[in-house]
Amino acid sequence: MRSALLATLAFAAAASPASFAIGPAGIVGPPPTPLTIVVVRHAEKASDTARDPELSDAGHARARALAAALRDEPLVAAWSSDFRRTRQTAEPAAQAHGLDVRTYDAALPAEEFARQLRRANDSGFVLVVGHSNTVPGIVAALCGCEVDPIDESVYGGRYDVRFDADGRATLTVSHFPA
């Protein structure tokens, strides 16, 4: 009986474009989504002199563009430092997935924060919004690779660190427009 079930499942999997995984007790379902941590710098900030400025109109547009780029991804968590500009960058994507934005301490060593992210998440997409002086360190700690500094005038860089089933990291760098 079990071999007939397995043969049927093998045929269904081969005939279908979708992937399947066999879990404990023969439970069948889609394979787990690998973990991808998307790290971005906050969007454009207002040019006022406040210590904790909000996003500018262009920044709000970029935050909405980021949310649109992540719309079809299985976003499971969103993190930002405790500044308005980072929260406002993360909020549209988080809200689109029914998530609250979690706060992390930007002064925390990047390696420690990277370990926290890996311990807290094992699959899906995780969004992290940081600053020009913190994003390269976070990405480097996650991927174990060198990451160039971010110029203070540059916005829209996206760093996707994808972990395979064996925990190996692959970094993809792209740009999301406003």
Residue ranges with predicted function:
Residues V129-H131:
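Short beta-strand segments
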Residues I22-S123, V135-G137, C143-A178:
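Active-site-proximal alpha-helix that buttresses catalytic centers in soluble enzyme cores
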